[in-house]
């Protein structure tokens, strides 16, 4: 069991399995997640340069992004020293550099220790989106459990499942500027949905 719980993302099998389940769920159920935040007011807000766009994607951050890239290429992720913020004051401790989504343009972002679903309008109850999000992630975890329960070599099969899932659903991962026109074109090439209004 000690191999399952480690500090680095790529060493933490349980974390990577849950991460893969969330990525798969967001990719496969983009439409349900978008519907969960639909309203006339929110349709105008999304993509209005003060909120995420209507195209759903997952922001992973630099550290996790490099881990995903390594897994996708079939190589072992290497530990990378955390960058520290230099304050120029000797009496203050070093602070680790933030690798999260600083410009907050991503609708679904991993921010170091949690996911944030940022498409909800201020008047929304979180109940509906949470119900959908929990249900779709549970669906993916059930599929993973079915695949792993009879595993002969659990850790190898878990790693293979994570790698396969990331390769099949990496189109939903985007770490750039979600407001850019280039992203809208790239998202269309990737086959991602751009449901700008509730009618769609």
Stretches found by the model and what they are:
Residues 17-20:
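Conserved active-site neighborhood of enzyme catalytic/cofactor-binding cores
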Residues 1-5:
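Short, small-residue-biased leader/transition segments that mark boundaries at the very start
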Residues 25-200:
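Acidic, glycine-enriched catalytic cores built around paired aspartates
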Residues 6-15, 126:
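Conserved phosphate-binding loops in nucleotide/dinucleotide-binding enzymes
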């Amino acid at each position: 069991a000690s191999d399952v719980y480690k500090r680095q993302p790529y060493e933490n099998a349980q974390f990577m399995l849950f991460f893969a389940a969330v990525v798969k769920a967001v990719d496969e159920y983009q439409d349900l997640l978008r519907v969960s935040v639909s309203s006339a007011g929110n349709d105008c807000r999304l993509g209005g340069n003060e909120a995420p766009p209507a195209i759903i994607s997952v922001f992973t951050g630099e550290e996790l992004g490099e881990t995903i890239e390594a897994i996708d290429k079939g190589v072992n992720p290497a530990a990378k020293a955390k960058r520290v913020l230099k304050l120029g004051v000797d009496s203050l401790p070093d602070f680790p550099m933030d690798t999260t989504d600083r410009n907050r343009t991503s609708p679904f972002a991993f921010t170091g220790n949690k996911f944030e679903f940022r498409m909800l309008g201020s008047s929304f109850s979180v109940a509906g989106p949470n119900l959908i999000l929990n249900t779709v992630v549970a669906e993916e975890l059930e599929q993973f459990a079915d695949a792993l329960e009879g595993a002969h070599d659990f850790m190898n099969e878990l790693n293979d499942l994570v790698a396969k899932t990331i390769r099949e659903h990496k189109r939903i991962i985007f770490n750039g500027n979600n407001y850019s026109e280039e992203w809208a074109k790239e998202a269309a090439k990737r086959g991602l949905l751009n449901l700008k209004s509730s009618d769609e």
